Curated annotation (Swiss-Prot):
PANTHER family: ADENINE PHOSPHORIBOSYLTRANSFERASE (PTHR32315:SF3)
Main location: cytoplasm
CDD domains named among the record's database cross-references: PRTases_typeI
Pfam families, A to Z: Pribosyltran
Pathway listed: Purine metabolism; AMP biosynthesis via salvage pathway; AMP from adenine: step 1/1
Protein name stated in the entry: Adenine phosphoribosyltransferase
Amino acid sequence: MDLNNYIASIENYPQEGITFRDISPLMADGKAYSYAVREIVQYAADKDIDMIVGPEARGFIVGCPVAYALGIGFAPVRKPGKLPREVISADYEKEYGLDTLTMHADAIKPGQRVLIVDDLLATGGTVKATIEMIEKLGGVVAGCAFLVELDGLNGRKAIEGYDTKVLMNFPG
């Protein structure tokens, strides 16, 4: 199945000069959505994964069905102030400054093998901060899976050394 046909490209959104890659059409089509989830599940199948971690919000949309299919748990990564219990945090650079991500301090047990699942790999800032938190908790990042990679934004370089699966590539 050619999943590229299920990604909408919106020019000059959210700002001038940016092309936003919208996964909504993929999610709206049951066959395409389930195909994408199955592709990530298949990637994870031989990695002995204990936990899926997904950054908000679209990482939830992709990561939760993967966790369900594998019969394992899901741990959310959120912006500050969104999780009710004790958290750890990691800062990351965005094109216009610093931002912070958090996850529950007990989300990952030492030695757990984790697959990070998100919709998009661009600069790699979000996934790099997520890796930092998982490893701080003693988890092992067994891989990273994305629906879309934006080529030319050096996201792969930010996570060099980590096994990565991407279903679609688009210009960045």
